[in-house]
A protein has these predicted regions:
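Specific aromatic-rich, kink-prone transmembrane helix
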Residues: 186-217, 234, 365-369
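Membrane-interface alpha helices of multi-pass inner-membrane proteins
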Residues: 49, 163-164, 208-224, 231-235, ...
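Hydrophobic/aromatic-rich transmembrane helices and adjacent perimembrane loops
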Residues: 183-190, 229, 307-308, 312-314, ...
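Membrane-lumen/periplasm interface segments of specific transmembrane helices
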Residues: 233, 237-238, 250-320, 331-342, ...
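Transmembrane-helix signature of polytopic, membrane-embedded enzymes
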Residues: 115-122, 141-170, 189, 204-208, ...
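Hydrophobic, aromatic-rich transmembrane alpha-helices
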Residues: 2, 143-147, 307-336, 366-373, ...
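Signature aromatic-anchored transmembrane alpha helix within multi-pass, membrane-resident enzymes
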Residues: 1, 6-16, 157, 256-263, ...
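Interfacial juxtamembrane loops and adjacent helix segments
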Residues: 29-38, 54-133, 174, 346, ...
Length: 442
């Protein structure tokens, strides 16, 4: 460790301790399991693993009714929405297979332990803990490399503060350490690696790096198909007007290598669809309102991203401060497209969630402008006020995460008046709850 990089190093350690501590504290106890996280949407991402490795039943799922009866994982009784029955009589997943692939090492370790120590049914406590703590470890390992990357562009103090605010001060904290089986924590490191690969590829182009870029884009795509726009990051990195098309034409062979890496990963999803539905491509039924997006995802009283996680305003402001960075066009283009896609989804509430969860996995990209804003502020003459504000909003985010997990901050029915009433409160009274949105307003 370089002596002049100690602040960001200790910040990284603090973030890691906080992530693991929150995972331990927020066990989400249930009647059937001390920790139960492969539920609701997370069940749809995870199901591929026990179905493949334990039950050898990836399309009939005959084993699942007994599992559901034992653990109650699907969320809504009688609504197995995570998998759809197709015309050929087989089930196919609503959610893509990529997250399960990323979870696989931790699942296999859990299964090995369960064979000796517990119930090896794929859903018992050992598996829940394996996925829960595995997600935290997966993210923390990526943060080690992310810190090194950030230090190429920002000073040590800025990176140290940025790691604290970007991870513990936004909603990604919830999805790494509490809702760990959801897709967000598993995709987060892919954004870290695409940033690092984009930067190193443009410095020194090799076939291996080209393939790794394609593999990373492919992995993100088969986790959540909307993550496919991650490709604009390497494509527009170090963008130079007037030289764009010629630059890529000169590197067309390496682009083909990236394409091969992408297709290799994408083919896993295609072969699964062919096996389960008889079709190479299957429509899972998502609907979009691209011409009439839902800006309340960002500003709404229910769970607005910039309302409930106000430190994210630094990510927005920082976009105006990165003009001189080689990643400026790349990051700005990605953030605009990503936000537009997220707010255009028809089911704009994204189920029960803290803030706008569909933006959380791309936090590494948004931290680049965020750190630009932090660097500007901490070197201003108002630094005392700046540090006070940072401390306040960081504390608020952590407090609200505890509110959310204890049912005080509602998952999708908040109103301005209700939020005012429970602000910094550890509980909500019956009078407070009268100000939640009614079922008719959902």
């Amino acid at each position: 460790m370089r002596s002049n990089h100690r602040i960001s190093f200790y910040s990284l350690i603090l973030v890691g301790v906080a992530l693991f501590a929150m995972r331990y504290v927020q066990q989400k106890p249930a009647d059937t399991l001390p920790m139960k996280i492969t539920t609701w949407d997370a069940l749809g991402y995870y199901m591929y693993l026990p179905a493949t490795f334990i039950y050898k039943d990836l399309r009939e799922l005959k084993f699942y009714p007994s599992i559901e009866n034992k653990y109650q994982l699907q969320g809504e009784a009688g609504n197995f929405y995570q998998f759809m029955k197709t015309e050929n009589g087989y089930y196919t997943g609503k959610y893509f297979i990529g997250v399960a692939i990323l979870q696989m090492p931790f699942f296999l370790i859990s299964h090995f332990l369960a064979l000796s120590l517990g119930e090896a049914d794929g859903f018992s406590q050992i598996y829940q803990a394996g996925i829960g703590y595995g997600a935290v470890l997966w993210v923390f390992l990526s943060l080690i490399y992310f810190r090194r990357f950030l230090l190429q562009y920002y000073d040590d103090l800025t990176v140290g503060i940025g790691l604290l605010l970007g991870i513990l001060g936004t909603n990604i904290f919830q999805y790494i350490s509490v809702d760990s089986a959801q897709s967000h924590a598993w995709i987060f490191p892919l954004y870290v690696y695409i940033l690092i690969l984009s930067d190193t590829w443009h410095r020194e182009k090799t076939i291996l790096k080209s393939i790794l870029l394609g593999l990373t884009v492919g992995a993100a795509t088969i986790c959540r198909p909307t993550e496919a726009i991650i490709f604009v990051i390497p494509m527009l990195w170090n963008y130079q007007k007037g030289n764009f098309w010629r630059y890529w034409w000169e590197n067309r062979i390496l682009v083909l290598w990236s394409g091969l890496g992408f297709i290799a990963i994408l083919s896993i999803q295609l072969f699964y669809w062919k096996y389960s539905t008889g079709q190479w491509v299957f429509d899972v039924g998502s609907k979009w309102h691209f011409l009439n997006p839902h800006f309340r995802v960002l500003f709404g009283e229910e769970k607005g991203w910039l309302i409930y996680t106000p430190l994210c305003w630094l990510m927005v402001w920082g976009l105006f401060l990165i003009t001189d960075k080689k990643f400026s066009v790349s990051v700005k283009t990605f953030i605009f497209l990503n936000i537009w896609i997220v707010i255009a989804w028809a089911i704009w509430r994204y189920g029960g969630s803290y803030s706008a969860r569909a933006l959380s996995q791309s936090t590494p990209v948004m931290m680049l402008p965020m750190l630009a804003a932090i660097q500007f502020l901490i070197h201003s003459k108002y630094k005392i006020l700046v540090y006070a504000a940072f401390t306040y909003f960081l504390s608020l985010n952590i407090f609200q995460i505890f509110q959310y997990n204890n049912g005080v901050l509602h998952a999708d029915r908040n109103t301005w008046e209700y939020y005012r009433r429970i602000y910094w409160k550890t509980s909500a009274t019956e009078e407070d709850k009268k100000y939640l949105q009614s079922d008719a307003e959902q």
